Amino acid sequence: MEIAPGIRRLGAGLVNVYLLEESGAVTIIDAGAPGYWKDLHAELAAMGRTPDDVRALLLTHAHSDHVGFAEQIRRESGVPVLVHPDDAALARGEVGQVRDEHGPGYRSWSIRAIAGFAFFALTHGMTRVTPIAEVGTLLDGATLDVPGAPRVVHLPGHTSGSVAFHVPARDAVFVGDAFATRNVITGRRGPHLATTFNEDNRRAIASLARLDGLAAGIVLPGHGDAWSKGLEEAVRLVRDSIPDELRA
């Protein structure tokens, strides 16, 4: 579905994949779940495109719910997959995911939200995500020579190699899991710090400063609906959401 001019989304907001189109060519941002593979082909067809029109797959980070179909499109269509160097080993499956000890207490968990995410994972192939055999790298501050010309903003915390992609031409920023507008564990909506799956919550909080001053009217998270009230307001709300025990 088109959510802004030149930007389309796969998924219903639980786990997001974005397609960024420019002059008939496409950049994919994140690869969601393996089960999105058929959805990807359908969305490209709706655009009048095929996998041959995809120039690159960019990962905001290398957690399994963002790696999804990456190896399949790399292997079958030769699409290069790019990730920050600090997440390259994770993308290749050489190391496992790490979680910070600070997360929402059990009282804030939502059985309904957890059940919904578990059902999604089971029905979209999340139990069999294939590591990426070969990845390229993208560096902080680089403007990438791919459709949309996204600029890389390193935001370590959720993972060491987490990044955002700022696309001034679309007045948009893709923030990955630097923050969410839908929490798959608690069910919370709106911009907030989703602490459960962060590698280092304090580092994630510090990284928010790297978003200050970026001009973007639309914010596109890895989980949840697009936020159309601007990045500045989104970051303000995220800071307001920080748990007291992480403010010291």
Regions found by a protein language model. Give the residues of each.
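Conserved beta-strand hairpin/beta-sheet module of binuclear metal-dependent hydrolase folds
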Residues: 1-47, 51, 165-180
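Short, solvent-exposed beta-strand-terminating loops
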Residues: 86-101, 169-181
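Residue-level marker for buried hydrophobic side chains located in beta-strands
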Residues: 27-29, 58, 81, 172-174, ...
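Metallo-beta-lactamase
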Residues: 33-35, 88-156, 160-231, ...
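Short, structured coil segments at secondary-structure junctions
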Residues: 3, 76-77, 215
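C-terminal regulatory/interaction regions
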Residues: 232-236, 240-248
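Active-site metal-binding motif and surrounding structural segment of the metallo-beta-lactamase
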Residues: 37-88
